Amino acid sequence: MAPKRTADGRRRKRGQKTEDNKVARHEESVADDFEDEKQKPRRKSSFPKVSQGKRKRGCSDPGDPTNGAAKKKVAKATAKSKNLKVLKEEALSDGDDFRDSPADCKKAKKHPKSKVVDQGTDEDDSEDDWEEVEELTEPVLDMGENSATSPSDMPVKAVEIEIETPQQAKERERSEKIKMEFETYLRRMMKRFNKEVQENMHKVHLLCLLASGFYRNSICRQPDLLAIGLSIIPIRFTKVPLQDRDAYYLSNLVKWFIGTFTVNADLSASEQDDLQTTLERRIAIYSARDNEELVHIFLLILRALQLLTRLVLSLQPIPLKSAVTKGRKSSKETSVEGPGGSSELSSNSPESHNKPTTSRRIKEEETLSEGRGKATARGKRGTGTAGSRQRRKPSCSEGEEAEQKVQGRPHARKRRVAAKVSYKEESESDGAGSGSDFEPSSGEGQHSSDEDCEPGPRKQKRASAPQRTKAGSKSASKTQRGSQCEPSSFPEASSSSSGCKRGKKVSSGAEEMADRKPAGVDQWLEVYCEPQAKWVCVDCVHGVVGQPVACYKYATKPMTYVVGIDSDGWVRDVTQRYDPAWMTATRKCRVDAEWWAETLRPYRSLLTEREKKEDQEFQAKHLDQPLPTSISTYKNHPLYALKRHLLKFQAIYPETAAVLGYCRGEAVYSRDCVHTLHSRDTWLKQARVVRLGEVPYKMVKGFSNRARKARLSEPQLHDHNDLGLYGHWQTEEYQPPIAVDGKVPRNEFGNVYLFLPSMMPVGCVQMTLPNLNRVARKLGIDCVQAITGFDFHGGYCHPVTDGYIVCEEFRDVLLAAWENEQAIIEKKEKEKKEKRALGNWKLLVRGLLIRERLKLRYGAKSEAAAPHAAGGGLSSDEEEGTSSQAEAARVLAASWPQNREDPEQKSEYTKMTRKRRAAEASHLFPFEKL
C-alpha cells in the first residue's frame, strides 16, 4: 500500500514498529487496495520508489515462501497495468497535461520499471521509516470539476492556430485607425450640430424676450395711460422743476407710491383684456396683481412727470450651453461628495433587490475563481488549497460577523469601524433631514421598523469629504441587503429631522429640485437725473433707489442680459452696472458679442455723448474693483492680463509697461498694453507696410506651406522660429506706386494687390468687365488682374481676383472696344442660333417628305382612297356608320403583308423604260433606290 500524506503535503517519520502491527496493516491494505487507488487524488508526478515497493509487497502474503516468485511476477504485471491506467486517467482529467513537456511523458512511462528494480532493496526500510496517516477527502466541488472534464468532452476537431503576419497587422491597425477617426468625426459633427441648435434656440428666445419688452414699453407710453397716471400724482411732486428732481426726490416719490399702491394676488386677470385695459383697471383701484404690473404703473407715473425713464429688463433665456454636460458633472459630484449616493439610488430600483452583490463579495468570487484555475493547473497535487476552500465562508456571513463585532465593542475605534463596515448610522444621522438628500437605508435581516429610519443623535464628528468618499464606496452597498424602510416613515423622518448634510449630493434631479427657487424681480426702472447727469436705478417693489447691488440681489440668477428701453424705443445694454461678475463668468454665458451688438445696432440711441459718459462710468466702476486673486480669472479678462495667457501673435508693448500688481508672483499688466502682432504680408492686407530698419518684435514658427517645406528640407531648422512679427507702431501706411508711360506697376507675381481701395496705383483705374484682357491684348494696352484677397481651400491658398487694373487714359478706349467686341460676339451668336434653327427645320421637312413617300409606296391605299373615289364628303350619320368598316379594313391591311404589289402596278413597272425610271428616281435618297 502506498504511503499516505498529511493535509499539509509532508510525510511524517516514525521509529521501529512491531511485527504484529505490520501484519495487521498489510492484511487491511490487501482488502482496500483498489478502493484506496480510486479515492486518493491523482498526482501528476511519479510515485516514490519506496511507496512503489511497498504497494507491490502489500499485495502478497509474507508467510507463503513457495508462491513468492509467482506472486511477484503477477504483482509486477498488475502494478504496471495499474500505473499505466492511472497515467492515462491523469492525462485525461488534468487540464494542464496538454501543455506538459515531452520529458515529463517519458518520465511517466519509465516509472514502472524503476519501481520493480528498487523493490527488493527498500521494502524493509519503507515499512519502518514511514507512518500511515488518515488522508483528508477532497471537496465535492473539485470532484465535480474532475468529472466535468471527461474524455467525452474533449474536442474532436483539430485545433487551428492562426498567426497574424506583419502585413495583416498593419492592415488591421490601419482599418481600426480609420474606423476610430470616422467615429471621432461623427461625434464631433454631432456635438457641433447640437451646439449650433442650442445657440440658435438661445438667440431666438433672447429676441422673443426683447420683443416682449418692446411691446410693454410701447404700452407704457400711451397718452391715455399717461393722463390717468398724472391725475393720481399729488401736487407737491408736480410743482418741483425738472432740474431739481434728484435722487432725494425719487426716494420721496417711491415712498408715496409704496404707501398708495398694494399688491393683491387675488385680483382677477382676464385673457381677453390687453395690457392697456388691465393697467387702467389697476390704477383705478390703486392695486396691482403682481410685481410686473406694479413696475408698469410706476413707469407711467414717472413718464407722466416728464422724467427720462428706462424700463430695465433682466432677460432670462434658455442656457447658451446644453444641460447635458451639467448633468454629467452633477453625476460626478454625486459619486464623489455623497459616498452613499450610488447605493441609495440603486436600492430604489427593482434590480438592486434581486442583486445584492457587494464589492467584497465580488473580490472574493474573483479570488475563488483564481484559486480554482490554479488548482486545475497544478493537477490537484496538494490538499492545502482544498482545505482553505472548505474553511472559506460566504461574503454575507463575513459582513454579518463584522457587524456583530461592531455591536459587541461600540467604544473601541468606533469611527473607523463604522466608516468601514456600515454607513447606515452616518446616513441616518446626517442625511435624513431632506427628501432630496436622504434615501431609506436597509436594516439587518427582516427587523426594519419606523424607528430605524428616524434620525438619531449624532455621537461622533462627521469625517472629512475624502474619508467619507472612501468609506462610502466600501460600505454603502452593504446596506442594501436588508429590507427597505416603509414608505410611510420616510416623510416623517425627512420632515422631523433638521441636521441634513449640505455638502451631500444624491442626483442631478435632486440638485435641480434644490435649485428651483421662486423667481425674483427681473424688471425695474432707471431715471436720468439732470443734477447728477447720470442714470439712477429705482426698484419700486422693495423701495430701493440708487442701489444696483440691491437690484442684483433681488433678481433671478444668473443675470446675463440686462437691457434698458427708454420712451423713444432706444435700447441700451446695462448689464455691467448690475452684475458684479461681468468681467469673469457672465461674459462666458453670453452669446457672441458681435452678434449681440449687431442686433442692438438699429435701436442705438442718437445721444452719443450721454452714452460715452455712461461707458466711462462703467469703466471707472470696473477699475475700482480689486485685482482678481485667481490666475484663471485673468484669462481673457477685459482689464488685466498675465504673460502666461498671451497668445502666439500677442505681446506686451512697451516692454517697460507699468505693473499694476502681482498675482502669486506674476506681474499683472493692463489689457491696453497687450497688442496683436502680424507678419509683413498680413500688414500689407491692411494697407500698411513695415518701416525700413525695423527689427521683428517677436519671432515665431511659421506654418505656411513654404515654411514647412523649408523645415523639412533642413532638419536643423525644425525648431527654428522663422516668422518675424511686427507691431502697429512699427508700420506705416502703404504708398501705392505710380503708373508711368501707360504701364501698370506690378508686384513680384505680375499682379496688383488691391486689398483696400487706397492701394490703387496712382493714375490707374479698376474695370470689372469680363474678358477685358483679350480686348486690351488686341489693342496692345497694358492690363493687369486685381487681387482683392485670398481663399483657403483644398489645403492651399488661392488668390481672389476682381476685375482688371488699367491706366486711366485708356479707360474710354477699352470701354468702347469692349462694347464693340460684345456686339460682334452677340451678332455671331445670333447668326449661329439662326443657322442652327434653319438646319433643324430643313431636317424636319426632309424627314416629313420621306415619311409621305414611304406611305405612298408601302402604305395601304385602298381604304384611304375609297372615300375620295366616291366623290364628295359623307354626312355625320354616314361617317358614324362607316367608321367600323374603315377600322376593320385598316386592321386587315395592317395584318396582311405589305410587300406584295398589285398585278396592275407590276405590269406598269414592266412597261416603263429605263430612262423614265431613272428620271423618277432622281429625287430619291441612295437608300431609297435599293
Curated annotation (Swiss-Prot):
GO CC, any one term: nucleolus
InterPro entries documented for this protein: BHD_2, DNA_repair_Rad4, DNA_repair_Rad4-like, Papain-like_cys_pep_sf, Rad4/PNGase_transGLS-fold, Rad4_beta-hairpin_dom1, Rad4_beta-hairpin_dom3, Rad4_BHD3_sf
Region (Interaction with ERCC2 and GTF2H1): 809-930
Annotated localization: Nucleus; Chromosome; Cytoplasm
Motif Nuclear localization signal per record, residues: 388-393
UniProt-annotated stretches for the region Interaction with RAD23B: 489-727
Keyword hit for Ubl conjugation: yes
GO biological process: DNA damage response; DNA repair; mitotic intra-S DNA damage checkpoint signaling; negative regulation of gluconeogenesis; nucleotide-excision repair; positive regulation of DNA-templated transcription; pyrimidine dimer repair by nucleotide-excision repair; regulation of mitotic cell cycle phase transition
Compositionally biased region (Polar residues): 466-485
Chain intervals with Acidic residues compositional bias: 120-134
Main location: nucleus
Biased composition (Low complexity): 342-351, 486-500
Modifications after synthesis and translation: Ubiquitinated upon UV irradiation; the ubiquitination requires the UV-DDB complex, appears to be reversible and does not serve as a signal for degradation. Ubiquitinated by RNF11 via 'Lys-63'-linked ubiquitination. Ubiquitination by RNF111 is polysumoylation-dependent and promotes nucleotide excision repair. Sumoylated; sumoylation promotes ubiquitination by RNF111.
Bias type Basic and acidic residues, positions: 16-29, 86-106, 361-373, 899-911
Protein's UniProt keywords contain Coiled coil: no
Listed GO MF terms: damaged DNA binding; DNA damage sensor activity; protein-containing complex binding; RNA polymerase II-specific DNA-binding transcription factor binding; single-stranded DNA binding; transcription coactivator activity
Region (Minimal sensor domain involved in damage recognition): 600-759
Positions of modified residues (Phosphoserine): S93, S126, S395, S397, S875, S876, S883, S895
Subunit structure: Component of the XPC complex composed of XPC, RAD23B and CETN2. Interacts with RAD23A; the interaction is suggesting the existence of a functional equivalent variant XPC complex. Interacts with TDG; the interaction is demonstrated using the XPC:RAD23B dimer. Interacts with SMUG1; the interaction is demonstrated using the XPC:RAD23B dimer. Interacts with DDB2. Interacts with CCNH, GTF2H1 and ERCC3. Interacts with E2F1 and KAT2A; leading to KAT2A recruitment to promoters and subsequent acetylation of histones.
NCBIfam families, sorted: rad4
Name under which the protein is recorded: DNA repair protein complementing XP-C cells homolog
